[in-house]
Every structure is written in structure tokens, then in C-alpha cells.
């Protein structure tokens, strides 16, 4: 094979390779002049228009065209408007490069086009290679947006589940310890003193003591009676008409001004019990996040 034949073959191969490297937008189903393609930063996009006809390229809605570099500004007008770029050729153009830069919140993008134009007697949709509109799609961006939305939904769902769990735990803690029932609770209490302070019920489950008062009375101050007979302020919480104390004592003293009432635990166990739940209640178990088992 002669050197001239090798040169011609190499040129033909280069031309074929270059043609394959260009990305031709896909024709629309209703009108082939409407074209669509997915963005690929490594591809040259082919644009084909007619002399005197306007061609618009549409980029992502969050992009703004910032720079346009054309090879022949005399015969090819380029007008950017937001995420749109309009072209209009005044003369026949052989394929020539156009470089476009866009900016968005996520950064800058580069687009490389190869645009050409030809003279056409009419501009109907039967004309081959006549583009009126080229619109980009962004599958990678859409997939990333779906992933972000899924992650955000997962976070919202997790926070919602945690809030529900927290509300259930708070509701449970706000309830008096009556879930064990009468057979498991100690009701053996006797009162001594001013009965105007007398609660309707007093009971314990071995861990917590509950005083149940009428709903419209003022709740007195409650003190535990130590073995030496001295008083100590009881740490209690008021839940509606119930007062819950996270301990059991042999005796309690209720005071409201000079009015005093003593309540004695007739079945008091000085050894006591442990709930084995990590809390002061047998019906509320402490669970550490991330703990096994």
C-alpha cells in the first residue's frame, strides 16, 4: 500500500472516529425539530440549523449561561438568557466549535458544541437535520436528587419515630404505677393525724409509692420518716391527682401549714427490692442506644 493510500485511510478513520465522538440529540416523537439528549461533559454535541432560523438550547433550570465562545461571531449570533442560549446563523456554516459555560449553586458546567448551518427553501419538520430546540436532561442530577430526598425522608422518618417513642415513654412515665394490679401491690397503710390531709389511696409496688388524692384538693408537702424519726423531703412528681415517689418508706408525713398527717407502711420491707430495669420503675426499662442484647 502506497504512502498516499495510507494517508487517505488514516484521514477517513479520523473522520469516522470524530463523527462517532459527536453526540446527536434524539428527535422528538411529535416533531423531529425538537431534540433531546442527556448531558455528558465528555461529549461534543452536534447542532444543525438553517440560515436565518433561530435555534434555542435549554440547560438545567438552576443554571445560568455565563460565557459563550463562538468561532465565527460575524456569521453566527449567540444570545444567552438565563438557562437558555439562542443561536442564529446569517450564512452557511461548516461545522465549527462553540464553547458554553454555565453556573449554578452546585458549580460550573462546560458544554462543547459543533454547530453547522445550511440554506433551506422551507423549514418544515420533513427537513432532515433541522433543529429548532435542543433540551438537555440530567440523569445523574436526578438520581442524586432522588438519593438526597430519600436520605431526607429517612431522617424525617427517624426523627418522627424517635419523637413518637419519646412521647410514649413520657406518657408511660406520667402514669402512676398501677399497672401491676392490686395483687402485686402493697395496700397495707394506716393513717394517724389530721384526716383532712388523708389521700383516697396509698400503695406501693416495692419500688415506688403512690398517693392518690381527690382531684380538687390541695396536695400537701410530703416527707419521708427516717429510722431516727426525723423528716426528709421526699422527691416526688405530681401526675394529675396522683403523687408518685420513687422510693418506699416505713412512714410518711404530710404537712399543710400546721396540719399534719402520718401514714405508716404496715408491710414495710427494710431490705427492699430492685426493679432490674435500670430505672426506679419495674414497668419502664432503660435501653442504651447501640447496646447489644
From Swiss-Prot:
Signal sequence range: 1-21
Cellular compartments annotated: Cell membrane
UniProt entry tagged with the keyword Lyase: no
Gene Ontology CC terms, in alphabetical order: plasma membrane
UniProt xrefs under Pfam families: CagX (PF03524)
CDD domains named in the record: VirB9_CagX_TrbG
Membrane-protein topology: Peripheral membrane protein
Keywords for the protein's UniProt record, in alphabetical order: Cell membrane, Crown gall tumor, Disulfide bond, Membrane, Plasmid, Signal, Virulence
Quaternary structure, from the entry: Heterodimer of virB7 and virB9; disulfide-linked.
Role: Is essential for the biogenesis of the T-pilus, which is required for virulence and T-DNA transfer to plant cells. When is associated with virB7, might function as a nucleation center for recruitment of VirB proteins during assembly of the T-DNA transfer machine.
Family per record: Belongs to the TrbG/VirB9 family.
Record protein name field: Protein virB9
Taxonomic placement: Bacteria, Pseudomonadati, Pseudomonadota, Alphaproteobacteria, Hyphomicrobiales
Gene name linked to the record: virB9
Amino acid at each position: 500500500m502506497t504512502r498516499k493510500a495510507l494517508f487517505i485511510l488514516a484521514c477517513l478513520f479520523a473522520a469516522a472516529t470524530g463523527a462517532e465522538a459527536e453526540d446527536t440529540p434524539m428527535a422528538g416523537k411529535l416533531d423531529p425539530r425538537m431534540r433531546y439528549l442527556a448531558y455528558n461533559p465528555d461529549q461534543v454535541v452536534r447542532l444543525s440549523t438553517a440560515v436565518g432560523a433561530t435555534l434555542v438550547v435549554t440547560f438545567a433550570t438552576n443554571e445560568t449561561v455565563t460565557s459563550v465562545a463562538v468561532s465565527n461571531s460575524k456569521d453566527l449570533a449567540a444570545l444567552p438568557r438565563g438557562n437558555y442560549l439562542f443561536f442564529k446563523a446569517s450564512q452557511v456554516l461548516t461545522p465549527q466549535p462553540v464553547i458554553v459555560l454555565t453556573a449554578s449553586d452546585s458549580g460550573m458546567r462546560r458544554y462543547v458544541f459543533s454547530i453547522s448551518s445550511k440554506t433551506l427553501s422551507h423549514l418544515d419538520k420533513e427537513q432532515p437535520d433541522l433543529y429548532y430546540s435542543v433540551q438537555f436532561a440530567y440523569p445523574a442530577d436526578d438520581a442524586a436528587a432522588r438519593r438526597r430526598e430519600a436520605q431526607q425522608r429517612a431522617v424525617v422518618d427517624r426523627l418522627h419515630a424517635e419523637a413518637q417513642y419519646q412521647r410514649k415513654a413520657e406518657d408511660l412515665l406520667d402514669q402512676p404505677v398501677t399497672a401491676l394490679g392490686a395483687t402485686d401491690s402493697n395496700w397495707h397503710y394506716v393513717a394517724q393525724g389530721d384526716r383532712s390531709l388523708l389521700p383516697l389511696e396509698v400503695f406501693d409496688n416495692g419500688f415506688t409509692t403512690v398517693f392518690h388524692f381527690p382531684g380538687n384538693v390541695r396536695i400537701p408537702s410530703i416527707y419521708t420518716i427516717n429510722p431516727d424519726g426525723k423528716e426528709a423531703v421526699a422527691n416526688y412528681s405530681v401526675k394529675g391527682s396522683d403523687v408518685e415517689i420513687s422510693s418506699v418508706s416505713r412512714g410518711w408525713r404530710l404537712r399543710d401549714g400546721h396540719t399534719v398527717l402520718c401514714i405508716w407502711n404496715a408491710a414495710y420491707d427494710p431490705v427492699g427490692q430492685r426493679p432490674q430495669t435500670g430505672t426506679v420503675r419495674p414497668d419502664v426499662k432503660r435501653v442504651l442506644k447501640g447496646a447489644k442484647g
